Amino acid sequence: MLHLFLFSSAASTTTAVEDNSTTMPPSSRSAANQNSSSSLHLCKHSPSATLDLLILILVLFSGTFLLSSYFSYLIHSLSLLSSHFPSITISLSSLLPPLIIFFSSDHSTEDEDHHHPSGKIPPPASFFFAFAVFFAASIAFLDLCCGSRSRKCRNPKCKGMKKAMEFDLQLQTEECVKSGSVKEIDRLPWKGGSESNPDYECLRAELRKMAPVNGRAVLIFRSKCGCPIAKLEGWGPKRSRRHKKSPAKLAVKGCIDNR
């Protein structure tokens, strides 16, 4: 009886789930399918990210080991050289005191271990120091190669954007053109080499349609860092302003007419 009861309860739950899935609207079904697919899509890329992290750690430790060995050999060679030239010892001690302390202690313990096989393990101070130096150097190298400084151009006002917009459209009124705030845009070269390049006549015609009265529409082309490099412009229709007559002039004109 217990088995029959469990089987009937399981069947009822499955039928209830099926009924709920059939009664769901199509929009909710699509949203659920998108969520499940996105979760699966994210889970597919997680092993590769873990592998990349492990590779980065291995590269850092291997570089640290090589750098520590290089510094150990360098300091050991300089110590041997300074024994023959005492003047070099003073300059080295004033320039590189931490390195001499770390690596000379490391080599002294290594020499003691060679003479005394039962000696202690050398202190890992040089290893940690080399790891810190290599880590700082790698961060500085990445900042120089991939940071905002590497993306900056010769313009001193460059912001060093990563992926700036390729072009920018500006609608300038008559007051804006006369104000002198667009001098930087006026200095830009023309797209195509000259203002009357026939390859860009269609764009200039569209700019003329969008330009305000007595103003202009300027299409500014930008580089990846965001700095403007070229321009296209189209002027709007020219209309003269109607000057309003002052009340004094109207009064004088009325007096003349009455006479």
UniProtKB/Swiss-Prot annotation:
The keyword Transmembrane belongs to this UniProt entry's keyword annotation: yes
Keywords: Membrane, Transmembrane, Transmembrane helix
Membrane topology: Multi-pass membrane protein
KW Repressor (keyword) present: no
Segments passing through the bilayer: 55-75, 85-105, 127-147
GO-annotated cellular components: membrane
InterPro entries, A to Z: At5g19025-like
Superkingdom of the source species: Eukaryota
Cell compartments where the protein resides: Membrane
Name of this protein: Uncharacterized protein At5g19025
Protein species of origin: Arabidopsis thaliana (Mouse-ear cress)
Organism lineage: Eukaryota, Viridiplantae, Streptophyta, Embryophyta, Tracheophyta
